[in-house]
Amino acid sequence: MAKRVESPTSINTFKQCKRKYYYQYIEKRPTLSNIHQVRGTIAHSSLEDFFDISLENLTEDNYAQTFRENIQMIFLKHWKDNKKTLDYLGLNNDQEMFYFEETMLMLMNWLNQFIENLEKTVKEKSIDVKEAFNYLKPIREQEYKSEEYWVRGYIDAIHEIENEIHLIDYKTNSSFEFEDSIKLQLAIYSLLYFEKHGKRPSKVGIFFLRHKLKLMKVDEGLLELAKKEINLLHSHTTSSDHIDSYPKCVGPLCKWSTGKCDFFDVCKPFEK
């Protein structure tokens, strides 16, 4: 069987449950949207667009208020643009308002920390707020694709800070931990960056929008982790496309109090 171009998401799905991987990436069964995915997309788009705001009327006196007004307008636009998708989820008005306000608070939390960094940059480098804004502006939403490893991914933000390269992903989930799935995602991003640019990024991390930025150093071990997991997946998927080669992993991620796996009904994990 030919190799598929994989992603951090598909590789983590394979590690979580091979049967789920089979349904999603081999049979290509449709998956359902949920509020966490939709609001995550809205938050990502809002942060990406924030760095395109006009700086023409920005001054030392109004920058904080200008930033807050802009990110709220950008967020509101993206929320409205996704209204059809949000309506499809079937949330009642109170539920939708809860997620709207919660996501806005996450963005304001990020912005408050950005303003702190901007003020620190103004002071340390003796530059004005416009120059500091552009200094802190990352390269955004870059696609990287490996011809050698048949894997690709989108990096939310690439920062060059004092001759160091930092790769950042934004997450709206409540955890503030580097779970194994997150560590693998960051390892794959590091490998993709290394293959394209010929050097390792200095650090990779997650900006947990409920909390703050959390970084880890990139070393050879992190790149080797990515290579190992990518190769294990390709070795498995190129040897068989038969459903029996993709066993179920029955557990709490099959069904929980507020939802179930997208493939629960076809998989029937608890039936013998």
Positions of predicted regions on the chain:
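Short amphipathic alpha-helical segments and their helix-coil junctions
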Residues: K18-T31, L86, E164-Y170, L233-D244
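A generic structural signal for short coil/turn motifs at secondary-structure boundaries
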Residues: T31-N34, S175-E179, L215-M216
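Non-catalytic protein-protein interaction segments used by genome-maintenance enzymes to assemble
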Residues: I127-I188
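Hydrophobic (often cysteine-bearing) scaffold residues that line and stabilize catalytic clefts
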Residues: I35, R39, Y99, T103, ...
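Charged, glycine-rich intrinsically disordered N-terminal tails and low-complexity linkers that flank
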Residues: M1-N70
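Metal-dependent nuclease catalytic regions and adjoining charged, substrate-binding loops involved
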Residues: V5-E6, E119, W150, D180, ...
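A non-catalytic, helix-rich entry segment at domain boundaries
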Residues: S46-R140
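Short amphipathic alpha-helical face segments that pack within enzyme cores
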Residues: I42-S45, L184-L192
